[in-house]
Amino acid sequence: MFLKKLELKGFKSFAKPITINFESPITAIVGPNGSGKSNIVDAIRWVLGEQSAKTLRGSRMADVIFAGSKDYKALNKASVTLYLDNQDKILPLDVSTVKISRKVNMDGQSDYYLNGKICRLKDIENLLMDTGLGKDTYSIVGQGKIDSIINSRPEKLRELFEEAAGISKYKSRKMDAEKRLEKTNHDLQRIEDLIWELEKQVGPLEKAAQKAKKYRRLKEELKVLEVNLLLDKWDKNLDRLSSFEEDEQLLIHKLKSLTNNLTESQEKLESLQRTLKVKKDELSRLRDRYYRQKSKREEAENTLCILEERRQGLSREKENLNQEIKDLNLRREELTGRLDEIGSRLIELKEKIDNYNQNYESKKVLLDEIKENLDREKQDLFFLRNNILDGNVELKDISSQFEQLKERGRHLEEEIKRIKTTRDKISSEYDALNEREDKLRTYLKSVDNKIEEKRSVLTDLKEEELNLQARLEEAKKRFNRTRNKLNEKNSHLSILHEMEDSLEGYYRGVKNILKARSKLTGIIGVVADQIEVDKKYELAIETALGGRLQNIIVKDDKSARECVDYLKETKGGQATFLPVNMVNGRKVNFKNNQVKKVDGFLGIASSFVDCEDYLKPVIEYLLGRTIISTDLKSAIEIARLRKRGFKIVTLEGDVINSGGAITGGSKNSNKKMLLSRSRKIEDLKKEVLKLQNSLGEDSKNLNQLENKLKEVLNKKEVIKNDIRDLEIEKNNYHKDLIRLEQEKTKLSERLEEIDEEFVDCHDRLGKNDAAKQKLEDKLKALNDDFSLEKNEIENKEKRVEELEARHENINDEITRLKINLAQLNEKRESLRKEEEKSNKELIELAEKNEEFKERYNKILSEIKGINNKEGQLNELKVKLSGEIEKLKNDLNLTEKEVEEKQQRIDMLQREVSDLQTRLDKKKDEKHQIELKITRLENRNERIVEILENDYDVKPEDGFDDRIKITNYSRAGQKVKELKNAIKKLGTVNQGAIEEYNDLVDRLDYLQNQHDDLLKAKESITKVIQEIEETMSSLFHEAFLKVNGEFNNTFKELFNGGQASLKLTEPENLLETGVEIVAQPPGKQLKKLSLMSGGERALTAIALVFAFLKVNPSPFYILDEIDAPLDDANVTRFARYIKEYSRFAQFLIVTHRKNMMAEAETIYGVTMEESGVSKLISLKLSEQII
């Protein structure tokens, strides 16, 4: 496997896309500092998954996107693609070329791609694991990486050995196993807590279960006795009901005769009322017409007022138009005057322009004459200068010798200056070293302060860690409490759902009908399922309905017959059916409003029930004669006021039956309430949802606390690392101080050498000046001979200068004339535009004047029309007044006729009232019989309610434990004895039996889970031990191999010496660090921190190549690691790379010629434009592309 190609788009300083082909074993990247060479190395590191922006020399990940320059806009994304040749299938992919890509947007979010398909960073890391490649492996050695490897802590250096040993995947597996072990321990602790809590509940719950069994036995015996007593009463009441119903039929016949007479009188009354209605309608029409005509007259009067206001408005507008016309005429006069003024100014400007043009032409002629004289003088000057040049031949030799001496003196002076400059520079360097020494000592003090600050922060983090751990423990407890509550509510909800699905609490006959409803037709459902009741009235309605909650509502009597036949055929028990087409509601009729005024009266029971409209008659039938009150006191007061056949139920479930019997007391809380069951299910669902939300919040809080704790732990580790880094920085400052002292000594010796050079140069300069003086005297005598000719030349030159000055002055005057002409022309153009604008405005004013005159004429015409309309409206007003007077007379006549008809109707109404009184008397007699019937029915209903609600028995179905009671007194005494025995038991948890059984099952289940978790813990612990043994073995094997190769490589690079690796904790191979000890040729064995920079760099290189031999990487990237080496070591290192390029591919960023010489392909990076890198390539056999 080797690197084939690298593509960059918008990455760092590369604004344009570039492609680098790696066709040679050794590829070099060269270029000046700051040109962007290292950005190519950063691109490879980045595409392999680097997550630290700081490592990529940025503050955030979006900094890798090209930020723009003077000529290039900033980009909004960057991408890098790396092509790997995989023909030898080192990577576990069935392709010959593997393409790894990474893209980033301005938000800093990265996407990874493998062969063009999006993937995770972990997928790429897993692919490259143990191949020697990756963002943190030794295959990429960046700027300063050599020193960082050597100066790494022993624990950090160990990571390179782990990569070489191939134990990264084992380390990852171990971490996963430890997480699973931690989770298992956590689950184990939670299970043990639950078992401990449940075991505490077993003893008390077992006693409660035994007590509940005894309670059930006594309760069953009491039920048999009470049911038989109630059934005997129910049979006797049925016999009395039959007698009362016969008396009721006789009264019904008499009521029918009175009703017919009343109907006849009512028909006569209705006929008269219809006649009266016709007359009243006629009266209403007359009144409507009367008021309409009055309204028209008022409307005509209003219109007259409006017309008057309009006429006044038009008059005002006419006056305003007159004023506008006057203003327009004034403006026209102003504009005419301005136009005359503009004409005068235009004439003046024309005269000025003509004068300037004449002056311009005369100046131009003068300029041409001066130019001609100037050319003639320059030609004479040229001939004089040539004559002097011809006479200078004799002076050339002397001048040449003089110049040589002069040049030599200049060189000596420059040498003296250079020596002075060098001395000043060295003195400055010496002062800078002193200053740098002071800064280093200041830095040392600053580092010490930072270390103390970091240690203080570390102490605060430890306290925060303890606080978070305590809060986390409390959050876990709260989470467990909420989860337990949720489990309890879910269990209760499940029980209610099971009861609902199994029809628990319904009579046998009702159950069989509901189960067979798919076979039968017309079944709507039981009463309990078809109504909705507010929780406040739930107990009252359940008490009022009793067993009738299980009555089955059907569409019609045919459906009822079908259901009864089905029960008979299947012997499925009995049920009561309510056909919608036959059931008629009965409702209490309050003629006496005193009942409503009773404090505590709430209303008729049926009004507190919601149902479908078509079922309301059924609800009226069931509850229309039942009143609901707040308590028993108000119920008794209502019963006293209204002694008729109705039932009163309180909100507490107490009942006053129609006969006056009062039923009340405590309710059986364990009784199966059919009406409230659905509501309880909905309430429980809401509670479960609330608990689930609360559990989610607790879980979220728990996760937040765990994340905060992890964050604090991470911060602690960062602070610890910072302290270690600061200690290293402090040590480096100490080393720099030692180096500074050495450099200062060298500079002092150099200053002494420079002072000796300075004295020698001064002596040589004195001799040179003496020789130069002799030649200078000789030159002076020759120069006197040419002085006359020079004077003549100077005169000519002055004449030329005067003419040139005069030429320039006249030229300036011409330029000023041009400017003045341009300004005058501009003013003339401005006046012409103003003249044009004023003429245009005059035209517009004329048009406006015409418009105002036209509007004035229209106003005069409109005023005339208003005067005509006023005359018409006055005529209409007189006509309407006559019609109104006639309508008033017709109204009076019709009102008299209506009054007569009303008197006849009053007489008939008295007759009808008398018949109604007699009818009501007979109805009262019938009502008394109905009351007696109702009382007996209510007594039987109460008996049925008690049987159905308290004992789940229907009289129609019979009773399996029916007995004949001969001694009612003895039976009553037995009931009291049984009730006392039940009372002595006290509070009984009737669900204790089921709860005890559930608790035992739950404990068994948790114990099995506990055993499974113990086995899992043992298994995971064993896996971790096996992984650790494998890691120790692989690490030890890799360490021995690298140690041997490191010593060999060190000897090859240093031409001798020795080096070795040592373990800081040999007995702990899983965590031991690694230290490096080296001995260059001719020196003692010592630690790397005491070696020179070049020795440390070469030692680091030896270590890298030792790793290469033990676990070769397919390619290596070296970023200026040869910088600290001298030429000899660079040559040796370059040959070494050349040798190993047979086994691996190298990409080298370098400045060194010796290293470039070994490369077959060289890429140059330049920055011709600021901030934009450009790539060029060259091969040994090719020109630069």
Curated annotation (Swiss-Prot):
Keywords: ATP-binding, Coiled coil, Cytoplasm, DNA-binding, Nucleotide-binding. Pfam families: SMC_hinge (PF06470), SMC_N (PF02463). One of its GO terms (biological process) is chromosome segregation. It is found in: Cytoplasm. Contains large globular domains required for ATP hydrolysis at each terminus and a third globular domain forming a flexible SMC hinge near the middle of the molecule. These domains are separated by coiled-coil structures. PANTHER family: STRUCTURAL MAINTENANCE OF CHROMOSOMES PROTEIN 3 (PTHR43977). Required for chromosome condensation and partitioning. This is Chromosome partition protein Smc. The gene is smc.
